[in-house]
Amino acid sequence: MKQMSYVTRWLYSTSHKDIGMTYLGFGMLSAMMGTGMSVMMRMELSNGNSQFFHGNNQAFNVMMSGHALLMMFFFIMPVWMGAFGNFFLPMLMGAADMAFARLNNISFWCLPPALVCMVCSVLMEQGAGTGFTTYPPLSSMSAHSGPSVDLAMFAMHLTSMSSLLGAMNFMVTVLNMRTMGLHMVNMPLFAWAMFLTAMLLLLSLPVLTAAVTLLLMDRNFNTGFYEVGAGGDPVTYEHLFWFFGHPEVYILMMPGFGVMSHMVSTYSKKPMFGEMGMLYAMGSIGFLGFLVWSHHMFVVGLDIDSRAYFTSATMVIAVPTGIKIFSWLATIYGGELRLGVPMLFALGFLFLFTMGGLTGVMTSNASMDVAFHDTYYVVGHFHYVLSMGALFSLMGAYYYWGPAMFGLKYNRMLGEMHFWLLFMSVNVMFLPMHFLGLNGMPRRMPQYPDAFMGWNYMSSMGSAMSVMSVLVGLKSVLVQLENGENEELEMQVTPDFTESNLNREIRDSDLDLILTRPAEYHTYSELPVLTSNSHA
């Protein structure tokens, strides 16, 4: 292969692997920025008096808004969809590349300008202290007159464009680029997860785009969509935003569900228990996610019938989620369990995601949510689901597939240290938030009565511990990049039930397990043929 220049390879790239790597680097940069913002907030909250922002409560809310947007739109979504999805979906499909290689590249290059807009919105004038929901009238010109909210809106537009282009690419790839013999029902669960995530993005993002476009018009062109004085209604924005916002939670979680199935199956030396059940559960979660958005809005004055419906529909989501949890446990049960680093993160995910789900059942009740709404109970709940569910499955995916991406093994001791430090720190950080919420401490408040100080101090200690775990994780990555060729992993990754690719025919659809590490720049010179219905 002719040697490409650095600029040609990384700037004009059409290789799904190179684009995946750029997404991974971008996601890590955004994660560092978002973590820094969260640490500033926890430093402020470690004491009831003003600690860090010197009474500038707007700055606290700006940090909070920036933290949320960076972590969701610039870290978890790009790493899941862009890095792991781009890198491994064609390999799992037996495809040469993604369906639209140049579209793949432009969907990445929408993100750096979006990040610039996001950072500028934090730094310019008074910043966008609206929360990531940007509800009017707080986000209207009367409350935030500078350009900050507009810049945050532009950032959301650009990330939406990136995600929509990526989602179309993923859907076309899955529908049209499968290798011979690989039917939809036989696809690995990670490929199904990416397909369902792409469908959720395609259906929900246009609604967000419409909502923030109307907000931009209210701010700049004197329209009155959300202005009560002009005959508008701010609750319209809430309905539009949460119609996107709830599927967004499953967009962040769904790839983790897929990768969890791979990790649990591999490290239990068993095929996944109830594979079709897992598939239908993922589809059900995605479908139901569009029917429950108003559970975020129980206190805006919904009528009693609406509250009864949204409570019931939200509780129904617990059923397919429970099916997934018990199927993972059934796969582990009776298997030859090997506690490699990816499996530690998978077990951590199972425990923490279940905890987050249990607190979610409580907040789904319209009567109880009147007490929980806008307290730290909700903050604790969604961080258990996202900071622990999405993050632990993502870290597990890195340790599981990192050797395949780089061809370099990680240091197992550092990986285990990373897991235990992160596991302890996130529990110390987020468990006290539930107690604060039950006692009535409101969200988004930098100063509070001394009665709340004990649990807040404990939570801030957890935040400091999490910084240590991030440093250990970075050290683990650096050691892998510097010395990965010399590391030894005692735990063989390929499970016993994967068969060889004799005569280019293989009997299992987890194609990534039989490829070289790192995978070749062009993975398949000749496309593989699958001969079995092992996943049907």
Swiss-Prot record:
How many and how are cofactors bound here? Binds 2 heme A groups non-covalently per subunit. Binds a copper B center.
Lineage per the UniProt record: Eukaryota, Fungi, Dikarya, Ascomycota, Saccharomycotina
User: Which cofactors does this gene product need?
Assistant: heme; Cu cation
The entry's protein name is Cytochrome c oxidase subunit 1
Coiled coil location: none
Question: What residue ranges are annotated as transmembrane?
Answer: 19-39, 69-89, 103-123, 152-172, 188-208, 240-260, 273-293, 315-335, 341-361, 388-408, 418-438, 461-481
A single Gene Ontology CC term: mitochondrial inner membrane
Q: Where is the signal peptide?
A: none
Gene symbol? COX1
Localisation: Mitochondrion inner membrane
